[in-house]
Amino acid sequence: YSEGVEDETYLRGVQVVGKDGTVTFTSVVPGCYAGRWPHIHFEVFPDIGSITDATNAVLTSQIALSEEMANTVYKDSRYPDSATNMSQVTLETDNVFSDGVDMQMPKVSGSVAKGYTVTIDVPVDTSTEPTAAAAPGGAGGPGGVPGQ
C-alpha cells in the first residue's frame, strides 16, 4: 500500500489500456461482506489526466464474481465470515445485481491451487460525458477485516 493507507483493507489500482484496448490487474478474491454479493468495483476514465477526480469517470460499474469460485475460495480459513455472508445473499437480493447480471458476470477459469483468471469485456465509449455518480454502496461497505 501507498503511504497513508497502509492500514486499509481494500485494494486499489490504476492501469492504462494498451494499444489493443485491454487492461490486466492481478488481485485477490475479495471477501464477501453482509448484504452484498462478492464483487469488484471499477471505473473508466477518458484519459490518464482524468483519473485523479472520480467525477471524471465515464463508467462506474461492478463485476459480480461466480458463485462456484467464491464458495470454493471461502472454504479457506483466511475468509472466516465470507461463507456465512455469501449464504445469506443471492444475485436476486443484491442491491446492484438484482436488476440483471448478464453483462457483469465474467468468465472464470483456474483453481484455488493455481489461481483464477477472471475476464470480462466492457465496451466503453470514452467520448461519453462523465456522469459524476458513484456506484451504490452496500450494507457492509468497503474494507473490513482482510479476507472476511
Give the location of each predicted region:
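Extracellular low-complexity, Gly/Ser/Thr-rich intrinsically disordered linkers
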Residues: 88-89, 93-134, 148
